């Protein structure tokens, strides 16, 4: 298994649109990617403009397939309009 934590900082005042965009994306991932074992958007309770996506993939093939989906391509083209900074990604193998 491969885990990823993607951190996002949303532009102030664009939270509702950002959450709607990511919620639709998460729904598509869960519906079409069986190798995405966990895919969940979370919000920082101490800073309402910070979000993180918890991602867990069954294997490297599932992660590679995720990056090639139509919904990922669409998200990459749209998400920048809502971000205050580039996303930060942390990736690594599951320990247990």
Model-derived regions, located:
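Non-catalytic surface loops within mature trypsin-like serine protease
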Residues: 10-12, 59, 93-96
């Amino acid at each position: 298994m491969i885990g990823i934590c993607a951190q996002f900082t949303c532009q102030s005042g664009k939270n509702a649109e950002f959450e709607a965009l990511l919620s639709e994306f998460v729904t598509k991932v869960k519906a079409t990617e069986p190798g995405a074992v966990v895919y969940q958007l979370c919000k920082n309770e101490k800073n309402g403009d910070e979000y993180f996506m918890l991602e867990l993939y069954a294997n490297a093939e599932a992660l590679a397939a995720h990056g090639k989906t139509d919904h990922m391509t669409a998200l990459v083209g749209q998400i920048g309009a809502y971000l205050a900074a580039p996303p930060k990604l942390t990736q690594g193998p599951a320990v247990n």
